[in-house]
């Protein structure tokens, strides 16, 4: 079984998650590869899909959304999972006591859920390299504001055991048996 882990990443955090998922699926004996969503022109050759994108201001990166929209008929008929990365920091609940991962689901997921019926969706914490240069207008503006510099937590907040566990669930859903071999 051939699995594509397509991703849209601005600073590399989501790419790292996608590569880890593909590696973990491979450790279960599945043929999986991670590729930037914008570069995929041959989606029909894959049997299953995991599509991920970074989320900013409750929106998935456009390359992830565009990949799903362009391939929606194919994704609707084959096993598909969606993920997002983006929440930053160590807090798992917000000031109102709500689960951060549940309240940061990209707005696009509701529409995509109706169109392609993914088997599951997941939100993972992301990462921000303090040395990374801002990308895009909004990031540049926030980085120039005195309060903006401290408003965004810096560091790697990705939960690798949670990412591995989700990849293991996907592998088992696709018929892989036993634990990951790597």
Which ranges hold each PLM region?
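N-terminal beta1-alpha1 ligand-phosphate binding loop
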Residues: 2-30
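Generic anion/oxyanion-binding catalytic loop in active/binding sites
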Residues: 3, 53, 152
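FMN-binding flavodoxin-like domain, especially the glycine-rich phosphate-binding loop
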Residues: 16, 24, 28, 33, ...
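Short acidic low-complexity segments
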Residues: 34-44
């Amino acid at each position: 079984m051939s699995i594509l882990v397509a991703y849209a990443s601005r600073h590399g955090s989501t790419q790292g998650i996608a590569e880890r998922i593909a590696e973990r699926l491979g450790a279960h004996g599945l043929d999986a590869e991670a590729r930037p969503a914008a570069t995929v022109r041959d989606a029909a050759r894959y049997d299953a899909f995991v599509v991920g994108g970074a989320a900013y201001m409750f929106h998935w990166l456009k390359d992830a959304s565009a990949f799903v929209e362009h391939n929606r008929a194919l994704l609707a008929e084959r096993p598909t999972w969606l993920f997002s990365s983006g929440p930053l920091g160590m807090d798992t609940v917000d000031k109102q006591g709500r689960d951060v991962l549940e309240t940061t689901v990209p707005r696009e997921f509701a529409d995509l859920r109706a169109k392609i019926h993914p088997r599951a969706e997941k939100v993972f914490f992301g990462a921000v390299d303090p040395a990374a240069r801002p990308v895009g207008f909004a990031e540049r503006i926030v980085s120039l504001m005195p309060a903006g510099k401290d408003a965004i937590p810096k560091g790697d907040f990705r939960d690798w055991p949670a990412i591995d566990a989700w990849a293991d669930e996907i592998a088992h859903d696709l018929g892989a048996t036993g634990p990951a071999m790597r």
